[in-house]
Amino acid sequence: PKVLLLLENNEANLYFINNEFINNKNIEIKPILGSCGNKLLLEKIFKENKVDIIFHAAAYKHVPLVQENPIEGIINNVLNTRLLCEEAYKFSIKKIILISTDKAVRPTNIMGASKRVAEQIFQCFSEESALQKKENPKKDCSIFSMVRFGNVLGSSGSVVPLFQKQIDQGGPITLTHPDIVRFFMTIPEAAELVIQAAAMSE
């Protein structure tokens, strides 16, 4: 890409990710402090920048915290997702990719359920966009797609740091079921999956 917009509501995270790119002269980086739940900010971003692709990774993803704070979890994971989709649709952004989770499959907790609803929101906008394209083939219509992750090693939402801490303290390791099986991918594998989702979405 020529320009990469980093929209992040956590000041420290935005500072650190911006610093990772600071020596990259091939891409212009624009750090933007704010939330995808801010309608006025989204409109400003889309008016001032030619946005082609949105990777929507904003979500509360720690299961116990969302379980204890369901209203905030739903606002962030569901309502803000709907607002982003509405604005992306309105501005005819080419592609919007939702970063979802395997916990959205037959969800057993509020976090998983909120991500499943976010997926359904994307599906609704995808169907509406496809209908508009069918009615007017020359119209620029957005493509809504999604990708589901399992556990990503080294990510902020991974269970691995918890396991490491429990092992360092002599155990035991907290498992939800004795027969539980967990699948992991690395950050580079996850990044490649997201890029493939963007490339394959039509």
Q: What are the functions of these language-model segments?
A:
Residues 5, 53, 94-98, 145:
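Conserved catalytic-site loops of classical short-chain dehydrogenases/reductases
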Residues 9, 37, 76, 154, ...:
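Residue-level signal for the nucleotide or nucleotide-sugar donor/cofactor binding architecture
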Residues 56, 60-119, 124-125, 130, ...:
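Conserved Rossmann-fold NAD(P)-dependent oxidoreductase catalytic core, especially the SDR/UDP-sugar
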Residues 86-89, 110, 116-201:
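NAD(P)-dependent short-chain dehydrogenase/reductase
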